[in-house]
Regions:
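Generic, well-ordered alpha-helical scaffold segments in large soluble proteins
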Residues: 13, 17-20, 76, 92-95, ...
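Generic signature of intrinsically disordered, low-complexity segments enriched in small/polar residues
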Residues: 13, 25-27, 105, 122, ...
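A structural signal for well-ordered alpha-helices, especially hydrophobic packing surfaces
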Residues: 18, 100, 168, 192, ...
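Cytosol-facing regions at membranes
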Residues: 32-42, 54, 58, 196-203
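Structured extramembrane domains adjacent to transmembrane segments
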Residues: 39-178, 182
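C-terminal tails and terminal domains of large nucleic-acid-associated
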Residues: 164, 174-203
C-alpha cells in the first residue's frame, strides 16, 4: 500500500474509499459527508441524546433500509462531542477498509461493563485485559506496522482514540451494565479495541 504523504491526499483518498466502505457501513446516499456529517448548526437546539440512541449511532445503521439506525445517527451527529467521535470513527473505519479490515468481520468478545468502567478511570494492564484483541494477531500486526509507517493514518487513529476516551468517560457515568454490554459490540467500540491493541494503549 502507498503511504499517504499529505493532508490533501488524505482527503482525496477518503473520498474514493468512502464509496467502497459506505455500502458496508450503510453510510452512503443517506449521509452526505459535506452536509450531515459536518453540520453542527442546530446542536444547541437538540435534546440530549439517550444512551440507547447513542449506542445505536455508534454501531452505524445496519443497512440502507435501517431508518431507525439513521435516525439515531442524525441525532448523535447533531451533538458536538458525539458527532466528533462518529466522524472520527467513520474516518478510521474508512482507512481500515483500504486493507480489507471491517468491524463486522472482527472476532472479538464484548468486554464486561466493569472493564470499560475501569479503563475510563485510568486502569491499564490486567484489569482491562479483555479489551485486548488477541484473536486477530495478523490484523493487529498489520495495523501496528501502518501506525509506524503512515503518519496520516497514525494521526487519524490518535484523533479517534482521544475522542473515544472522552465519550467513554461520559457514557460510563450514564449507562447501565446492560447498556455497556451492547455498547461493547458496536462497530465503534470494536474499532477502538482493535486500534487500542495495535497501539499498545491497554498495556
Amino acid at each position: 500500500k502507498n503511504i499517504i504523504t499529505s493532508q490533501s491526499e488524505f482527503h482525496s483518498r477518503l473520498s474514493d474509499l468512502e464509496n467502497k466502505i459506505y455500502p458496508h457501513l450503510a453510510l452512503n446516499s443517506k449521509i452526505d459527508r459535506s452536509s450531515d456529517l459536518n453540520d453542527k448548526s442546530n446542536s444547541k437546539d437538540q435534546m440530549p441524546i439517550s444512551v440507547k440512541d447513542l449506542i445505536g449511532a455508534l454501531n452505524f445503521p445496519k443497512d440502507e433500509a435501517d431508518s431507525e439506525g439513521f435516525r439515531k445517527l442524525r441525532i448523535a451527529l447533531a451533538d458536538s462531542e458525539n458527532g466528533d467521535l462518529l466522524r472520527a470513527s467513520q474516518d478510521v473505519q474508512t482507512l481500515l477498509s483500504q486493507d480489507g479490515i471491517y468491524m463486522d468481520d472482527l472476532i472479538v468478545e464484548p468486554s464486561q461493563p466493569t472493564v470499560w468502567r475501569n479503563f475510563s478511570k485510568g486502569h491499564r494492564g490486567p484489569t482491562v485485559q479483555s479489551l485486548w484483541v488477541i484473536e486477530n494477531d495478523e490484523t493487529v500486526f498489520l495495523i501496528s506496522k501502518k501506525l509506524s509507517d503512515d503518519e496520516i493514518f497514525r494521526d487519524t487513529v490518535n484523533h479517534f482514540l482521544r475522542h473515544f476516551d472522552s465519550s467513554l468517560n461520559e457514557l460510563c457515568k450514564k449507562a447501565s451494565d446492560s447498556e455497556l454490554l451492547r455498547f461493547s459490540d458496536t462497530r465503534t467500540a470494536r474499532a477502538f479495541k482493535l486500534l487500542g491493541t495495535a497501539s499498545g494503549r491497554f498495556n
